[in-house]
Amino acid sequence: MKYLEVTFTTHPCNETVNDVVSALAGEIGFESFVECEGGIQAYIQQTLFDEEALKEMVANFPLPDTRIEYTIKEAEDKNWNEEWEKNFFQPIVIGDRCCIHSTFHKDTPKTEYEILINPQMAFGTGHHETTSSIISELLEADLKGKSVLDMGCGTSILAILASMRGANPVTAIDIDDWCVNNSKDNIALNHIHNITVELGDANLLKGRKAFDVIIANINRNILLADLPHYAACMHPGSEIFMSGFYIQDIPFIREKAESLGMEFVHHREKNNWAAVKFIMK
């Protein structure tokens, strides 16, 4: 899976400007951000990159007296296992109940749920606020014996946790073949046998039997586009957990979900990132 690295140089360079850059870039497909000298670096899959959308974003930047410049290059291919070991990548503990770590970690904290992953890329490892927020939701949800769908599964951390918490069966779907292959590796690493991994998008859901629980940690635009597909495979009482967007995006998600017959339950916030829960009426 190839990524592009776009370096935004912001004038002035401050937290507010960088937060707005990240929010707007996230809406056009960028999925990871790193602060750098003079601005912020953003990463996007090459196949999803739309430079016209990027130019429009910069041209219509909403903050007054602000100038944005950018450069584009291919993100460096690295052996992420080696890089993370070298940089002392630490296990992630969420809610004192779930520890996510890799095979090279020793003496990890003992928690109720332990998820092993092989970090073969920079993204999808459980560090992001959206992933940890959905994990917190799953730790509180009643999943025993329930059918679960993980859309945009990435490394399948969420699908794996759902299975560990008693969900059965579990379906994990991603549009990227690398994610599908890495998901299968991680599922095997955790000795899980009831997760089916599929390559594709929300169109795969047509004609499916309804799921009891849906997880979708993607981004605002894809969620808004795909919510009708999700609604079509939910029954009264089905729950859906969504993340991948900012607090200010909740009204857009809520309006769309409620128009499809869903009832808003609650949201949680972490560093301005949001996770929401709805139930189908």
Swiss-Prot record:
PANTHER family reported in the protein's UniProt record: ELECTRON TRANSFER FLAVOPROTEIN BETA SUBUNIT LYSINE METHYLTRANSFERASE (PTHR43648:SF1)
Domain of life: Bacteria
Localisation per UniProt entry: Cytoplasm
Name of this chain's protein: Ribosomal protein L11 methyltransferase
NCBIfam families: PRK00517.2-2
Main location per the UniProt record: cytoplasm
Catalytic activity: L-lysyl-[protein] + 3 S-adenosyl-L-methionine = N(6),N(6),N(6)-trimethyl-L-lysyl-[protein] + 3 S-adenosyl-L-homocysteine + 3 H(+)
Gene3D superfamilies: Vaccinia Virus protein VP39
GO molecular function: protein-lysine N-methyltransferase activity
GO biological process: methylation
Organism in which the protein naturally occurs: Phocaeicola vulgatus (strain ATCC 8482 / DSM 1447 / JCM 5826 / CCUG 4940 / NBRC 14291 / NCTC 11154) (Bacteroides vulgatus)
Family that this chain belongs to: Belongs to the methyltransferase superfamily. PrmA family.
Binding site for S-adenosyl-L-methionine: 131, 152, 174, 217
Enzyme nomenclature, EC number: 2.1.1.-
Record key words, sorted: Cytoplasm, Methyltransferase, S-adenosyl-L-methionine, Transferase
Physiological role: Methylates ribosomal protein L11.
Pfam families: PrmA
Species lineage: Bacteria, Pseudomonadati, Bacteroidota, Bacteroidia, Bacteroidales
An annotated GO cellular component: cytoplasm
InterPro entries registered for this protein in UniProt: Ribosomal_L11_MeTrfase_PrmA, Ribosomal_PrmA_MeTrfase, SAM-dependent_MTases_sf
